[in-house]
């Protein structure tokens, strides 16, 4: 992390977070914790939501299971408004059951977001952590929008249960595609209000979830995964991208998916990277 943060110095408020109120899910570890730390250093009042207690950077720590809408609603009520930025960083990895992954990564975050929207200040920002695993959302747009337009958490659960061909063995990527589709759909709807929705699609990042990805995909897959910059990302590198996305300075950017993958998708989309080489032989 930057020297300024390590020393605990108060940074110049270039990004205009001083005196604002931010909500961060997954604030106990990984990208969420790094985001909370940066926001606090920038002068924001940070409220963390996690299944574990959040660290010292947060003003308020709320124990929330994102598959439980009652817990989500209670946390939103406790935090109250106005809210200036929402960072949806929590998530389950590929080793978790597919339905649980869909409910936490997509349905729970959607429920939280919709609960927070009425409390948002003018020009507020909402940023989701998606993944390069969700890059195919446009190719599957019809399917993803069908899920996105389900009316609420329970309806999303029913949709997932009725579509095992979509989420079976692919819950993680399906959840990330749904996030990107929701950001595009809802971001477009909310654009006239000034509320901004964007997603960040990280490549491999050294968070506490990485061992779970290695367990499900295999060490060889990640050893061979193309890294144009030569390494995995650090959590704070992804956190800074999220903070930039939600900054009031970023007032014209909405309904879009952004990639923080060290050049991976650039190589993939232009032929410099052949993912077929990573696939196990049939």
Task: Name each region found by the language model.
Residues 118, 188-189, 251:
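Alpha-helical segment proximal to the catalytic Tyr-Lys
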Residues 111, 164, 168-172, 177-180, ...:
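C-terminal helical subdomain
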Residues 12-46:
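Canonical Rossmann dinucleotide-binding motif of NAD(H)/NADP(H)-dependent dehydrogenases/reductases
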Residues 93-94, 99, 125-192, 204:
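Catalytic loop of short-chain dehydrogenase/reductase
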Residues 201-212:
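Short, flexible catalytic-loop segment of classical short-chain dehydrogenase/reductase
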Residues 4-5, 9-14, 254-282:
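Short C-terminal tail/terminal secondary-structure segment
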């Amino acid at each position: 992390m930057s020297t300024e943060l390590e020393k605990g110095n108060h940074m110049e408020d270039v990004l205009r977070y001083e005196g604002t109120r931010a909500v961060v899910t997954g604030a106990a570890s990984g990208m969420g914790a790094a985001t909370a730390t940066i926001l606090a250093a920038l002068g924001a009042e940070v409220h963390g939501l996690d299944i574990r207690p959040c660290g010292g950077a947060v003003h308020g720590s709320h124990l929330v299971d994102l598959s439980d809408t009652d817990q989500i609603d209670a946390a939103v009520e406790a935090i109250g408004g106005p809210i200036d930025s929402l960072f949806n960083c929590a998530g389950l990895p590929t080793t978790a059951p597919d339905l649980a992954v869909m409910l936490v990564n997509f349905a729970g975050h959607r429920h939280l977001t919709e609960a927070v929207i009425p409390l948002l200040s003018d020009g507020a920002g909402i940023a989701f952590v998606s993944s390069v695993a969700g890059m195919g959302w446009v190719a599957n747009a019809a399917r993803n929008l069908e899920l996105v337009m389900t009316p609420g958490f329970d309806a999303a659960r029913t949709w997932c249960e009725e579509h095992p061909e979509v989420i079976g063995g692919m819950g993680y990527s399906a959840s990330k595609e749904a996030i990107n589709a929701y950001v595009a759909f809802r971001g477009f709807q909310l654009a006239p209000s000034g509320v901004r929705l964007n997603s960040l699609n990280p490549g491999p990042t050294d968070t506490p979830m990485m061992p779970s990805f290695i367990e499900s995909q295999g060490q060889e897959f990640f050893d061979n995964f193309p890294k144009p910059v030569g390494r995995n990302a650090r959590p704070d590198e992804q956190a800074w991208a999220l903070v930039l996305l939600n900054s009031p300075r970023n007032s014209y950017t909405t309904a879009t998916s952004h990639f923080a993958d060290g050049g991976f998708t650039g190589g993939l989309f232009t032929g410099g990277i052949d993912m077929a080489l990573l696939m196990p032989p049939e």
